[in-house]
Amino acid sequence: MKLLSVDGLRNLVASLGQTAFYGAVLETLERDFIRWGEFIKTPRLATHYPFGVIELMPCADRQFYTFKYVNGHPQNTQHGKLCVVALGILAEVESGYPLLISEMTLLTAIRTAAVTALAAKSLARPDSRHLAIIGTGAQAEFQVGMVQQVLALESLSYFDLDPKAMDKFAANMAASGLQLRRCRSIEETLKEADMVITATAAKRVNDLIQLDWLKPGAHIHAMGGDCPGKTELGQALLKASKIVVEYRQQSLLEGEVQNLDDSAVHAELWQLLAGQLPGRESDTELTLCDAVGFALEDFSIIKLMHDYSSQDGYRQYFDEIAMLPTMADPKDLYGFFTSATGVTSQP
């Protein structure tokens, strides 16, 4: 079995180059969304606690099965820990044998940003140049980098309640090639924004954006509302928007649309990417992607990592680990402890 550690991923991305790596993730994810009907899909299994949530996110096609373990603990940073950490496993369906264990903390941030970019391809105006981001925590830089893959951005305004988070974001974005504008309020941040990303972490019902703060024809990508009782946008804004989600069954439970019915949803994202339904239809309509994160996205990126693990030039970034016993007699599992003959551990 192979292992992709955080150090292995860092070295893999350095070898490929961040732009090329982001491009590969986008291409792979779009291709998997388009073959939506080939996947066995289910909403994530969430266990909620007063201080956070722990989730399992499975997805499979006819060849591979994946699942991700992921948490969400907004107060972790007060204790020097990440709010979100994740691990993933990819297995072959035919035997059920796991093939890869992968870090998924960084890959989750990357695939989440890739969804933002894919939605922007269909929902943002093609001439969008100014991006605004509300919330400059761990996800923010990935979001901007991915959107730059699909839109020719020129400027970026940003706001967070935490000045240190804005300092961190500004330092990381210094080499982005964008004109940066640090703002003192959400309203100020949205001035002249062609596209808006909301990426806040507080688990509560919010109403962050007023309709009259938005430029006509703006596109909003809301990713902070991702569990029951946690939303970022008010009813007036939702009802004025063309809404696209990843997976209706999950979004109606967890997303911004959790207090609306199914008729409020224009489409699932795969339907836009596959050309089944239109995305943006005018320069003035308000569009909204209500993104909560879906397991197909994890399948896509961990399968891409598995592909890299067998390619010359990249396989060295993956470790071989002995996690499964190989038996001379597969019915004699106990023999692993009692005999050294014909008994090995399988990497």
Predicted regions and their residues:
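N-terminal ligand-binding/catalytic initiation module
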Residues: 1-109, 117, 124-127, 296, ...
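Short helix-loop-beta connector
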Residues: 123-130, 152, 215-216
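Glycine-rich Rossmann-fold phosphate-binding loop(s) that bind the pyrophosphate
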Residues: 136-137
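NAD(P)-binding Rossmann-fold cofactor-contacting core
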Residues: 150-173
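Short acidic low-complexity segments
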Residues: 178-193, 208-209
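Short, well-ordered coil/turn residues at beta-beta hairpins
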Residues: 197-200, 222-223, 246, 302
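Rossmann-fold NAD(P) dinucleotide-binding segment
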Residues: 203-219
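Rossmann-fold NAD(P)-binding glycine/threonine-rich loop
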Residues: 214, 222-278
